[in-house]
Amino acid sequence: MENKTIRDRRTLRREYRTVTNQVALAGTLTEEFSFCRRGRADSYYSNTICILRNTGSEFTIPVLVPQTWIPLSVSNQGRFVEIRGQFRSYNYTEGDKARTAMQVFALQMNPKGRFRSLPCMDQIFLDGFVCKMPSSRINRNNKRVTSVILAVNRSYARTDYIPCVFRDDTAAAAAAFYPGVHLAVWGEIQSRVYEKRPACGEPEYHTVYEVSVQHMEER
């Protein structure tokens, strides 16, 4: 399994060198698709995909899928699927607050049935530019973690702003980055829950989706 994972990552690197944002996921849909919005050429439905790591931990990642790829005549909850697409950021307002949502936009989805024994996959490649000064901290395990926002261009003059997390040996190097640095990164998408304590009232819990960087190249 480990050798296959290494081969998959090498294939991903070769295949994605000519694009700026590419995601490959394989996991189980957690619910039925729900209508999200209607575009010019298609309707789009949202769902979440559950991915089991080799460590035994699970992550759920939100996905947006065109109706073209969805078999609406059958139940999709619990179905194992492979998705290829892009990790995108979307701005929206909640009350009087501006929010940013992260979502995988599916360019292709292949249903594989209900085979839970199939191997999961979570791979991402990004080619973009550091858009603000990195934030570095020491976590509770006494290890350095550096957060970087990567601006990744896509078609129609749009840009996605994607949070990336660097750990271990790459964290110190990432802490020295500055706006405008051109990076290519490989890794996986992860979800993380954090607690925000307002000045008054109950604590708020938020889920963030970010890229856990496993390899990087400065360009």
Regions found by a protein language model. Give the residues of each.
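OB-fold and OB-like single-stranded nucleic-acid-recognition modules
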Residues: 1-219
